[in-house]
Amino acid sequence: MGKNVVVLGTQWGDEGKGKIVDLLTEHAAAVVRYQGGHNAGHTLVINGEKTVLHLIPSGILREGVQCLIGNGVVVAPDALMREITKLEEKGVPVRERLRISPAAPLILSYHVALDQAREKARGEAKIGTTGRGIGPAYEDKVARRGLRVGDLFHRERFAAKLGELLDYHNFQLVNYYKEPAIDFQQTLDECMAYAEQLKPMMLDVTAELHNLRRAGKDIMFEGAQGSLLDIDHGTYPYVTSSNTTAGGISTGSGVGPMYLDYILGITKAYTTRVGSGPFPTELFDETGATLAKRGHEFGSTTGRARRCGWFDAVILRRAIDVNSISGICLTKLDVLDGLETINICVGYKNENGAVIDAPSDADSYIGLEPVYEEMPGWSESTLGVKTLEELPQAARDYIKRIEELVGAPIDIISTGPDRNETIVLRHPFA
């Protein structure tokens, strides 16, 4: 009997999901992406060699693992082909193992132009998108006017829909944002060129997942971004345009929730955020700078510096509830090495002095102060440690306290960037 295991982020993204997916796919027959697009940036380090994936599932570096892109993912053909080419240049076979749902929405040049024009127009009030067209592509999907991967293989139908879409979007670009129009013929020609390359990789991903399930194969579901960026449950409006929480798995892959056996919540040992939006535990002092430097906290997709702060048990409790988390993977524990004291946020105090839980929108965070519990740090190095017993006592106490505060077990601890620098206490596929 196979198991279906989910790996998703519990914070604002950048928790280290790529490494853990790569580690666990040793036991998986297939890995599927079910939401987001090439705004994701999953960094894998294998034998010291770094690989960053944006759209292709992280299982691609494991020989024989099938990689699937589900209907909930927005696909930019140009970005996908660049990523495939880079991997092939490294000797990684991709086209034989990558399959893409025909129902996945396309990101095209006008989505990128709109995304960037809107952020520019917002000025200081910008959301902090990656500018890669993710939001506008999801808008077209929900408005039922979007083009999908399967449309690429019907030229006349595709051209007719594309013409209508460009009439609609170019009007905004030219008249409202004062940006140049997107050319119809150039866009059509580019898309038809990509169609020839993508056609052999197209597959009914939902049907394939159920075939694998019925055959008793282990399947990994790879989330992108983090729970606090969910369009419904995140710090709205400073969120992404997809459901990053567990509910997005079923809608984005076609595999119902009753078939999911274990949900692993990837959680950084401190907290980071890229772009705008509330961040109660953010540090503006030397400690924050130290975390950023040691943790190499720069976005793998945008290159933007990440904001850093103390561990926030409040948002993790919310993520555990929303996702029905089975177990936690605590990453980047080694970044905390050498700190004399470490703070954990255990609640938020509002203007009336009452301690409250996580709000459901960005405005409700205004005026909140984090309530901290101070713990002793440790001077010993935890980098590369592979057993719980080898960790300093203070590090073990920190892990135990997090478990107590959030009500979920820490099943995996990451002590470095390489797939081998990991402590596995309970294996999700066991």
From Swiss-Prot:
Family per similarity comment: Belongs to the adenylosuccinate synthetase family.
Reactions performed catalytically: IMP + L-aspartate + GTP = N(6)-(1,2-dicarboxyethyl)-AMP + GDP + phosphate + 2 H(+)
CDD domains the record matches: AdSS (cd03108)
Alphabetically ordered keywords of this record: Cytoplasm, GTP-binding, Ligase, Magnesium, Metal-binding, Nucleotide-binding, Purine biosynthesis
Cofactor(s) the record lists: Mg(2+)
PANTHER family in UniProt: ADENYLOSUCCINATE SYNTHETASE (PTHR11846:SF0)
Binding-site positions, GTP: 13-19, 41-43, 306, 332-334, 414-416
Cofactor note as given: Binds 1 Mg(2+) ion per subunit.
Main localization (coarse): cytoplasm
Gene3D superfamilies: Adenylosuccinate Synthetase, subunit A, domain 1, Adenylosuccinate Synthetase, subunit A, domain 2, Adenylosuccinate Synthetase, subunit A, domain 3
The protein's name in its UniProt record: Adenylosuccinate synthetase
Residues bound to substrate: 300-306
Source organism phylogeny: Bacteria, Pseudomonadati, Pseudomonadota, Gammaproteobacteria, Pseudomonadales
Organism listed in the record: Pseudomonas putida (strain ATCC 47054 / DSM 6125 / CFBP 8728 / NCIMB 11950 / KT2440)
One cellular component term from this protein's GO annotations in UniProt: cytoplasm
Binding site for IMP: 14-17, 39-42, 130, 144, 225, 240, 304
Gene field: purA
Coiled-coil stretches: none
Subcellular location: Cytoplasm
Short name of any one Pfam family annotated for the protein: Adenylsucc_synt
Subunit structure: Homodimer.
Molecular function GO labels: adenylosuccinate synthase activity; GTP binding; magnesium ion binding
Magnesium found in the keyword field: yes
Pathway involvement of the protein, from the record: Purine metabolism; AMP biosynthesis via de novo pathway; AMP from IMP: step 1/2
